[in-house]
Amino acid sequence: MAERDNRRGRRDDRDETPEFADRLVAINRVSKTVKGGKRFGFAALVVVGDQRGRVGFGKGKAKEVPEAIRKATEQAKRQMIRVPLREGRTLHHDIEGRHGAGKVMMRTAPQGTGIIAGGPMRAVFEMLGVQDVVAKSIGSQNPYNMIRATLDGLRKETSPRMVAQRRGKKVSDILKKDGEPAEAAAEPAEA
């Protein structure tokens, strides 16, 4: 008879950790007022990604900084989303994300542009694996809201394959320009 492991059907995710990179975005000292005075602790905000199209964020609170970072990292790994990237380096189309008073606009960029984004958005794009993007944050500059708005926008991104599947067409039909065949649109006209 085969030996049964004692995990009770749970997966062991500890083996997957080396494939993810993480970035500490913010750390705050927080306090809780109790009967005897104030209890101080730390809150950490972490972005985790595989730099190949998956990203997530988490926040953790603890009495010590390393424990708060560990909790935030674990939460981020549980909340990862997959984002389709064009040529593995940029977004497929311009997108806008919102969360609370925060609004984020993200635009595709030609190769060599780099990541033009501020603060927490830069961490999200680096962990996602985006190499060329232009992003602007409007409204709330709170790092929690900026990250949530960025991820809201990234969830809305669709690849040509997804659009073609939804419309019941071929990818080549979706990539046509103004009624031209896809091959003619891809190649410049000879003069």
UniProtKB/Swiss-Prot annotation:
GO molecular function: rRNA binding; structural constituent of ribosome
Low complexity: compositionally biased ranges: 182-191
Annotated stretches, region: Disordered: 158-191
Pfam families with a match to the protein in the record: Ribosomal_S5, Ribosomal_S5_C
Any one annotated GO CC term: small ribosomal subunit
InterPro entries, sorted: Ribosomal_Su5_D2-typ_SF (IPR020568), Ribosomal_uS5 (IPR000851), Ribosomal_uS5_bac-type (IPR005712), Ribosomal_uS5_C (IPR005324), Ribosomal_uS5_N (IPR013810), Ribosomal_uS5_N_CS (IPR018192), Ribsml_uS5_D2-typ_fold_subgr (IPR014721)
Biased composition (Basic and acidic residues): 170-180
Domain S5 DRBM positions: 20-83
Keyword Ribonucleoprotein: yes
RNA-binding in keyword set: yes
Keywords: Ribonucleoprotein, Ribosomal protein, RNA-binding, rRNA-binding
Any single biological process term in GO: translation
Family under the similarity heading: Belongs to the universal ribosomal protein uS5 family.
Family annotation (NCBIfam families): rpsE_bact
Annotated domain remarks: The N-terminal domain interacts with the head of the 30S subunit; the C-terminal domain interacts with the body and contacts protein S4. The interaction surface between S4 and S5 is involved in control of translational fidelity.
Oligomeric and partner information: Part of the 30S ribosomal subunit. Contacts proteins S4 and S8.
Chain's role: With S4 and S12 plays an important role in translational accuracy.
Record-given protein name: Small ribosomal subunit protein uS5
Gene symbol of the encoding locus: rpsE
